[in-house]
Amino acid sequence: NMFGTVTGRTSPSSSKYVFSASKWARNFIKPGLGNYLVYLDYKSQEPAIMGYLSGDQNKIKAYQSGDIYIHTAKLFNMVPDNATKQSHPEERGIFKVIDLANNFGQGPGAVAESLKCSVSHAKFLMNQYRNIFKVYFRWIDGFIENSLNKTYFSTCYGWQRHIKSLFTTKEGKKKHIHKSLLNWPIQAHGGEILRQALIDLTDENFKVVALVHDAVMLEIPIPEFKQRLEEAKQIMVDASIKVVGGPITVDQEIIKSNYEQETKDQKLFNKIMSHIDRYTPLYN
């Protein structure tokens, strides 16, 4: 379902689509004879979109640094310039919590609980974060206010969300939709990027076999695989530039035989198949 969510992201059926099912089911994915599969996904797409749409240079530099959370810790002067994920995991973890909380509407109470600190210290960190990335927050606040005045939100390509009420009711409780409004322009433009990439890849005769949130899976003949893989990655980067005005890098996972799982999912698949094997002789 290409426009199945309010943000315009795809929403395939969990009972009919392998990437919406439990992860162990991905073991059934396998390229056709004479082909490889490749899974291409946009790396840290949401923060990249935030930076490019708002023009916040601190956000953009944080994304382009390769590690948003370590870069933010450096902006707070909490780690040295040569800090890495390996050398300062604790500080990195702090700014991962703060980043997600500020960008998606969590309050200081939730942050304090996650960081095991006082609410006042959580407020201080969150206010500092908003000050460092003030261009982004000024943009998102303005985007929401302007959209509410029009009573609808819109992406640069015209996908819209019409606002009838600022509240939803769930299980008899009234809830403000502010968090989803903060997230909407980011996710919706992510959907636009994926659609643009799909169009451009199809125009260049790539066989797109799956769409997965911010990723595509392609099937490419082995003799031309290396060249076509690089072409596909560049097409996806170019699609991000068309939509949000800046390049979003693309990671790759090549599948030459059956899909390789993480250990816990592989164990579950093996367990399920062993149970099936026990019963198979009974019906032969």
Model region roles, listed by residue range:
Residues 50, 107-120, 216-233:
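Catalytic palm subdomain of template-directed nucleic-acid polymerases
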Residues 93-104:
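Short, amphipathic alpha-helical "recognition" segments used to contact nucleic acids or chromatin
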Residues 73-77, 112, 116, 237, ...:
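Residue-level preference for well-ordered alpha-helical positions
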Residues 60, 77-94, 119-125, 136, ...:
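Short, surface-exposed acidic
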